[in-house]
Regions:
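Intrinsic-disorder-associated interaction segments
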Residues: 2, 109, 252, 282, ...
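N-terminal non-catalytic accessory region
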Residues: 20-181, 185-266, 270-285, 289, ...
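Bacterial N-terminal signal peptides
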Residues: 10-21
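Serine-hydrolase catalytic core
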Residues: 278-293, 297-298, 302, 306, ...
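Short, aromatic- and cysteine-enriched interfacial helices/patches
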Residues: 3-4, 76, 292-293, 309
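Bacterial N-terminal signal peptides that target proteins for export
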Residues: 2-12
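C-terminal subdomain of alpha/beta-hydrolase-fold enzymes, centered on the catalytic histidine
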Residues: 307-460
Length: 460
């Protein structure tokens, strides 16, 4: 029996589609592309600045790793030992018992920064640098700036300033300029450093930039940086951050100033709405709003959980009072921090490049849904318990991004529409931007990013 031609075509097409699907996508040969640059001997050193959760934390005494820890800890720990102690006089965090000591290159089989380091070495010809070790003539170096991601980003920016001074000493050049590659929150502390150096300007509302990075930085590449904040950070702060089978609880996160500083910028668009689709005019940096909603340290459940850690009511009362005052201080500092990054500059002597993802629908606006007298936070449309007919939750709540940072926040815009100019109070001197299809935690390992990174770093 002979088959008709029309019967053969679907089978043929199916086979061709399967063949195409199984064919690996072409990958650039980075060694061949950039190996030709090895003869250039005047390449500035590169500093890698990781993001939140991006460094390993250990106890100073016995050296036990508090973050990330062994696989069993990743799966089952609530990470209460990550909480920072609080100075009752200054209301500043203190870390007498723990320190950051290494980058989180891999954890539980997931690569975070290992592949970008490998690319810098194998294709870019860079060698790891250690501050305090003199650089040889013509040597290309990269440095990994390891900081305590729990701390105030102003404090981390001051540490970056000292780090760059050490690198200048390595090169014997007090006028040396460096390149910086910063991932996620690392981009925020880098932008603060460019504007203010080690100066803490968050004690009042004057926010006067001194352009500290003018003579110290050549190029800055921001990767997946939430330049206008992220509503993911608000949700995580309220409910805790999921790690393995557990969560880092809000009472631990509330001791970390950096987490407050990831909240959405006041000019970043509507960050909160009702289940009926009505935007709410609420100040995310107002402790009064958090108290009204019963979120974080104002949650009765959280306060009861904290009380169980103490032997007496008086001790529990004292700590809860201290934590509440600490919260109020650091949420106000966070307000000033996000504004400090967008005040206008007289000049922008460094080059600013942004790379990020724009292929995943990413939370932009959280919905507060009233359920049995409680204000429940919803980050995605499928979480709405009782959808209101006619409300387009997907359009209202989500926007293209990398799953964590929206495209508009990456570009410091309050609108996804590129024809809409930035808000007049958001100054973001961007030279150019490039987009890839990758999730937030995997951006550094993306081959297209690595290709463009080397091109940017090595171009004259």
């Amino acid at each position: 029996m002979r088959l008709r031609a029309g019967q053969k075509i679907p089978s043929l097409l199916t086979g061709l589609l399967l063949l195409v699907a199984c064919t690996p996508a072409p990958r650039p040969d980075l060694v061949k592309l950039y190996g030709v640059t090895r003869q250039a001997t005047d390449q500035p050193p590169v500093i890698l600045v990781h993001g939140i959760l991006g460094s390993r934390i250990r106890s100073r005494g016995e050296g036990d790793e508090l973050w990330v820890g062994r696989l069993s800890k990743i799966l089952f720990s609530d990470y209460e030992d990550l909480a920072l102690s609080i100075d009752p006089v200054t209301l500043d965090p203190v870390t007498p018992d723990s320190e950051a000591f290494a980058i989180t290159d891999q954890a539980a089989g997931t690569d975070f920064y290992g592949r970008i380091i490998e690319t810098l070495e194998s294709a870019g010809g860079y060698r790891p640098g250690v501050p305090g070790t003199p650089a040889r003539a013509g040597e290309r170096r990269y440095y990994v700036f390891v900081y305590d991601w729990r701390q105030d980003n102003v404090r981390s920016a001051a540490a970056l300033d000292a780090y760059i001074d050490h690198i200048r000493g390595d090169y014997g050049d007090p006028r040396l300029k460096v390149d910086i590659v910063a991932h996620s929150m690392g981009g925020l502390l880098t932008r603060y450093y460019l504007r203010y150096g080690s100066e803490d300007v968050l004690n009042d509302n004057r926010l006067q930039p001194n352009l500290w990075g003018r003579d110290r930085v050549r190029r800055v590449i921001l990767l997946g940086t939430p330049n206008l904040g992220s509503v993911n950070s608000v949700r995580g702060f309220i409910e805790g951050v999921k790690v393995g089978l557990g969560r880092i609880p809000t009472e631990v996160l509330a001791t970390m100033p950096s987490v407050y500083q990831l909240f959405p910028h006041p000019k970043g668009g509507d960050w909160i709405a009702t289940a009926e689709g009505k935007p709410l005019d609420r100040d995310v940096f107002s402790a009064r709003i958090w108290r009204r909603f019963g979120w974080s340290v104002y949650s009765p459940e959280v306060r009861q959980r904290i009380r169980k850690r103490f032997d007496s009511e008086s001790e529990a009362d004292a700590y809860l009072g201290l934590l509440t005052r600490y919260f109020e201080r650091h949420i106000e500092r966070a307000r000033r921090f996000v504004w400090s990054l967008t005040v206008r500059l007289e000049e922008t002597p460094w080059q600013l490049i942004v790379l990020g993802g724009d292929c995943e629908l990413t939370p932009r606006t959280i919905v507060v849904e009233e359920v049995d007298g409680k204000s429940m936070v919803r980050l995605r449309p499928e979480e709405i318990a009782s959808p209101v007919p006619g409300v387009d939750y997907e359009t209202m709540m989500l926007e293209p991004g990398d799953g964590t940072v929206t495209k508009s926040s990456l570009l410091a815009r309050n609108s996804l529409d590129p024809t809409v100019p930035r808000h007049e109070y958001v100054f973001f001197p961007l030279d150019f931007a490039f987009f890839i299809c990758e999730s937030h935690d995997q951006l550094t390992g993306n081959m297209t990013f690595q290709d463009n990174l080397l091109h940017i770093l090595l171009s004259r």
